[in-house]
């Protein structure tokens, strides 16, 4: 027989996040919403289409990259900040940036990567070189690395549709 304790005898520990943590979470949630909206997606896509041919994989950073980076910040970061100010009373981008440095390990990789494109030139350049590689069909293709190996023999052979239906 199981001995059940009443709830008032249980020792519950309640963790309460600070107001600053809660505010940070609200901002991140709003950023996720904003970057998924059509308006932000259109702004970013149009910007990438306009300039992606300027960027290459070379180690050298061309002088032409600087005005493009500044324009990107002016258009996309300002749009993001404007949306956050409209949605969150008293929002301050400088305070958020400071808070982001303290919480960067808690932020989703995609969100952090996108935010870094506003402050880290190399992240910005990488975004463009990745976009260009994808546009030119040089994206990462893992399909050629897949091999089906038989458990009955040591020879490897590709899986054909007829073999797949036989194993079902």
UniProtKB/Swiss-Prot annotation:
InterPro entries: ARL2BP, BART_dom, BART_sf. Pfam families: ARL2_Bind_BART. Gene3D superfamilies: ADP-ribosylation factor-like 2-binding protein, domain. Transmembrane segments: none annotated. The keyword Acetylation does not apply. GO terms for cellular component: centrosome; cilium; mitochondrial intermembrane space; nucleus; spindle. It is found in: Cytoplasm; Mitochondrion intermembrane space; Cytoplasm, Cytoskeleton, Microtubule organizing center, Centrosome; Nucleus. Keywords: Cell projection, Cilium, Cytoplasm, Cytoskeleton, Mitochondrion, Nucleus. Plays a role as an effector of the ADP-ribosylation factor-like protein 2, ARL2. This is ADP-ribosylation factor-like protein 2-binding protein. It comes from Danio rerio.
């Amino acid at each position: 027989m199981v001995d059940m304790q009443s709830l008032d005898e249980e020792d519950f520990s309640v963790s309460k996040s600070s107001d600053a943590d809660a505010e940070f979470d609200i901002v991140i949630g709003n950023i996720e919403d904003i970057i998924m909206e059509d308006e932000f997606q259109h702004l970013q896509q149009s910007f990438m289409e306009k300039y992606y041919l300027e960027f290459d994989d070379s180690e050298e950073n061309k002088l032409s990259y600087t005005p493009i980076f500044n324009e990107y910040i002016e258009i996309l970061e300002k749009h993001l900040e404007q949306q956050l100010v409209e949605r969150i009373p008293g929002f301050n981008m400088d305070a958020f940036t400071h808070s982001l440095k303290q919480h960067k390990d808690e932020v989703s990789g995609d969100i952090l990567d996108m935010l870094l494109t506003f402050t880290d030139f190399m992240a910005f350049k990488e975004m463009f070189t990745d976009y260009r590689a994808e546009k030119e069909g040089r994206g990462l293709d893992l399909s050629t690395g897949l091999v089906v190996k038989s458990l009955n023999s040591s020879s490897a052979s590709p899986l054909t549709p007829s073999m797949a239906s036989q194993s079902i």
